[in-house]
Amino acid sequence: QPLTAAVALKMKRAVRLELSRGEDFMGGMPSPACNVTLKTGATRDGQFCALDATVLMDNGIFASPWGNLLATLLGSTYNIPNARVEYSEINTNKPMGGPYRAPSAPLAAYVLESNVDLMAKDLKLDPLEFRLQNAAETGDEMINGTQWPSVNIKACLERLKAHPLYQESSQEENTGSGFAVGIWRCNVSPAGANCRMLEDGTLQLYLGTSDISGIHTGFAQVVAETLDLPLESIEVLQQDTQSGPIAPVSGGSMVSYSVIPAIREASEEVRERLLKLASDHFEASIDDLELHQGTVRVKGVPTKTVSMANLVKKAQSTRGGEGPVMGSGNCSLPENAPAASVHWVKIRVDPETGEVVPLHYLAIQDVGFALNPMLIEGQIHGGVVQGLG
């Protein structure tokens, strides 16, 4: 990609990078190869007491942080008092491994959940109740010595337990069902945001974050809600690292969580500026004013209404006035916001051809506050399809 950008700058025209399937596997940062040996121990009444894992990871020519993530997820998804993970990275003459869908999380989930199913079977315990008994909770110590922030594995399991598909699922001939827990620590980063309202009532939001998965739509929603503006009047402007506010990389499941508090703070500052301008305009107390669909009005007096655009025009055109209506925000959150999930599937297998057909699929995700449910559903559907292959 950097070479493609360099050629585009040199040629002063659009350049497209097109890879064959083989080239994509060789040079597209594929998921690292991994071998995990896992042993667990539990008491007869179903309490995990030990975990021991050995991990060998081939990350190609460069070192990577994926092993630390893998070790954390293996040793911390369930509350296991005695856990050890030995991790070795093997560097080989291959392309660097990359973050293919939450780096190392699918590997950890596959080996750990397979082991949990085997353990429940050996103990003759219900696999869901076994997981409920042992799932990590908020405040539990992770294998790296830190504590889990808010984590809702048990809530996801309880939702599965109560779901009609799970309760009513019968096993017809050549069918089977199963479920697994998934957990991702997510990340967090310092972030900033700036807002400016123009004379036509447009609100410009200046950010340093690149759009990923439609997050700029969610950012505009936050501003629109704070200022009671129509979504189409919000303009999200992505800036470069030289001129834009500090921002996290667009990855690692952290962008919205890290940036939205800064956006809210910036838009709240614009809100306070507008209320102050309207207070002077009406000679009224700020407490008696409210924002309403692009205007500021006196509560209970519909005739006393002024558009935000007019307030901005007056502020910017009056000598010695308030000047541009702007706001800035910044934040640095103290902890991650882990995302837990439980997925259940029922399949039918053709015994003659080996063809596997999914009959029902249930995805239960702790998404926190669903700022844009449609975008979230799209991400979940995409992950399910990718997981099914």
Spans of features found by a protein language model:
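Cofactor-binding beta-sheet edge motifs in enzyme active sites
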Residues: Q1-A155, A162, Q167-G389
